[in-house]
Amino acid sequence: MFPVKGLSVSADKLKVEPGAIVGTAPAAPAPASAPAVSSSKPSKKRKRHGGDKDVNVDASNLVDLWEKVIEQKKEGVADGVKKHENKRLKKEHEGQGEKLSNSNNDGNQGERKNNKKKNKNKNKNQGEHGIQVAQKKGPKKVEGEEDEDDNNDDADEWEGIDEDEKHASSEKPTPKKDDKKQQQLQQQQQQKKQQKNQEKDNRNGTTSNWQQDKPQPKTATPAPKLTPLQASMREKLISARFRHLNETLYTRPSTEAFKLFEESPEMFTEYHEGFRRQVDVWPENPVDVYIKEIKERAKVRFAPKISGGAEGGKSLPPARFPLPRDQKTKVCTIADLGCGDAKLAKTLVPLKQKLRLEIHSFDLQTGGCELVTRADIANLPLPDNSVDLAIFCLALMGTNWLDFVEEAYRILRWRGELWVAEIKSRFAGSQARVKQPPQKKVVAHSVGKRKKGSALAVAEEEEGDPEQNNLDLAVHVDGDTSKLKKPHETDITAFVEALKRRGFLLNRDFGDNSVDMGNKMFVRMHFVKAAVPTRGKCVPKDGQEDTTKNKKGGQKPKPKFIEEKDEQEEVKDEAAVLKPCVYKIR
């Protein structure tokens, strides 16, 4: 016989049930207080795991009882019992879309509404009870459970909640309302912390990190709301302001311009804003050309074997030659004189370790850039012979631009390079160097000019200019057209001679490439510190004494028919080699 917990009956009192199956043990009799239960039909009540003492255990129901009590599986509904509920459950689970009759639906809708409220608390209790049973694996029976089973007689009836829905509802940890409350509390706590941090920062006079990370607005941003007419007028005002400042800088010495920008630094930003607008119209910016050339030449280690232009050899581009460097440190020191917004330094400073460069930028005002040093170009804060490359990129401004050249000679090492880029319209040509006397021209209506075949005219035509004749012969015989001047070619001979007197020569290694006139707006020239100056502040003192003495130690006689003021007049004319940019008053 299958043992049942809580029962101890002696073997003498056991009796064989009538109609029992042969080979099976008789079931234990139920107590007197309990109602009689027939062996053929089990109880219809769904009882808890503690109320199994009233059920007879047979071979037929042994598996069902094991699954129900031990494995905690729910008992299936018997055939013929609760047909209406069984059909509904089958239709919902098997996916059959059949609808029940209206009479059955009307009768069950009221039960669903009433049972939904009751089952909320029951589902919670059942879910908690099911978890405890799974953990303990069959808890012991507690007294007083029979009364609870009697009160739950209607538990087997379908209450409008599916089994899957019961499990899903029991697995939910907390309702949504609690989550919203927790989120609101967390947000309030974070706001309180931020307010406390702000109060501390205000007391200490500091700003928090999120305030420091905010981008600061630009100073020179245009107005956000401008009509097309206002925008065009603003462009005209900016260009007019630039022309006024540009003319001021070209017609004054550098000392006055230095004081002007010292008193009003905002004029420096206004000037360069207009300058950028002007450069945008140009086909090419000389600063970009210099940046590219520095990058290319910094990678070259050795000069090519064939030198260009020195002995009539083939001229090579500057990119084939290395940059001038200090022999000890192997570092090329660059001085950008009149740097403006320091575009060259901003581009090359991140590459200075790779290319072994050191860059100094100077201008009349820093413009808020840390890479720029405020200084007058005529008086640079650099020692003598400390720079390998000096650059004047559209920076020879002011009436004392020759002082800039002399200062560049002072700071450059021997064989150091000087790069100059200047507007073509500024070069006055060779006529600005020497004042020539007015030539006597024959009047068009003179009698002598009207004579046909005069001997003087024929002689002049036959002789002609000897230099021009030689050039014509070179063109016809040798085909050499390099020395012929084009009608619109810029004449830079006076400028080259002025720099030659101050110790700078065109780079013979580059040959014809030492002067680049390919751009229609400006000229680029490559000079080298390779001569002793005869003019300016860099003239050696010993050389001045030697030039005034002859071989015997006495004074050299002054040449006749030369006035003493010729040298001063020639110096004045040298300053006029570069014309200032003066605009027409409209």
Curated annotation (Swiss-Prot):
Organism: Chaetomium thermophilum (strain DSM 1495 / CBS 144.50 / IMI 039719)
SUPFAM superfamilies reported for this sequence: S-adenosyl-L-methionine-dependent methyltransferases
Basic and acidic residues bias (residue ranges): 65-83, 164-182, 539-549
Acidic residues bias spans: 144-163
Protein name: 25S rRNA (adenine-N(1))-methyltransferase
Source species, domain of life: Eukaryota
GO molecular function terms attached to this record: rRNA (adenine) methyltransferase activity
Biased composition (Basic residues): 114-123, 550-559
Keyword Transmembrane on entry: no
GO terms classed as biological process: ribosomal large subunit biogenesis
Membrane keyword on record: no
Record family assignment: Belongs to the methyltransferase superfamily. RRP8 family.
Protein EC: 2.1.1.-
